[in-house]
Amino acid sequence: MLIRVAALVALLTSLFGCTADSDAPPPSGRSMAMATAPGDVPASRWHAVLIAGDNNSPSFDNGIDALRDKLSARGVRDIRLLTSDPVRNPSAEVASASNVSSALRNANGAEACLAFITSHGTEAGVVLRQASGVVRPSALDNALDAGCGTLPTVVVVSACHSGVFLTPAMRQPNRVVLTAAAADRVSFGCGAGDRFTYYDQCLLQQFDAASTWGQLAQATRACVQNLEKSMGVRTPSQPQIFVGSAVANLRLPGR
């Protein structure tokens, strides 16, 4: 990320974070059967939904635009963008709760799913400012179940308090769930002068060198820890990682 403001200003801004103005068993009664333990899913068979939930910082739409470009370069064709800044991204859908749910549920013919959400967050979920809504963990889990079922599924939630998405229901064997912060922590880099959030910057920087989602998760977390330390952040965000047993070796598209 290119820090466009003086270091002291960036440090003071970071103190406010990105809040709005392990393997655990799956819940009983839910079928988790999978034909095989997946590793390499062809890039053309991924269904990707990239969501920028707030428009008071350019970092969120920058994040989905940059990840779209990386996925496209790897051969992913089924990419849906949802934005809270329709002036900037006029071809993208507005990030409303209903549009997010519809995009996630429409994975017909896919062999793997990716949901990437970057925004401000609260302990209730991720903010969708343009639609005055919130994506809650239960709603995300329901949409993923309906659209992706037992397909290999990667969920990246980049927001303050995003660790709230690591619920027992979300921790399914076919899912990788990465969050930018623990449930009781804020994340950083969402000011007006930031190009990317800290977490998004690190994920994008580490993307090309990683082979599996697990490798990318570990490298991204280490990058965030180093970046926060260099910026003098006193209360680190503590990015969280869950990799389900059925997708331990799931490779990035095109790797």
Feature roles, as predicted:
Residues R4, C18-A110, G191-R195, A248-R255:
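Boundary/activation segment at the start of structured domains
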Residues V5-L15:
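Bacterial N-terminal signal peptides
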Residues P26-M34, G39-V41, A209-R255:
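Caspase-like cysteine protease fold
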Residues H47-I51, I79-T83, C113-T118, T153-S158, ...:
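Structural recognition of the beta-strand scaffold that forms the well-ordered cores
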Residues D54-P58, D78, D85-N89, S119-G125, ...:
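Solvent-exposed loop/turn segments at secondary-structure junctions
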Residues S59-A66, K70, A95, N99-S102, ...:
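Extracytoplasmic/secreted proteins, especially bacterial periplasmic and envelope-associated proteins
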Residues S119-G149:
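A short, glycine/acidic-enriched catalytic loop
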Residues V154, A159-Q238:
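Active-site-proximal C-terminal subdomain of hydrolase catalytic domains
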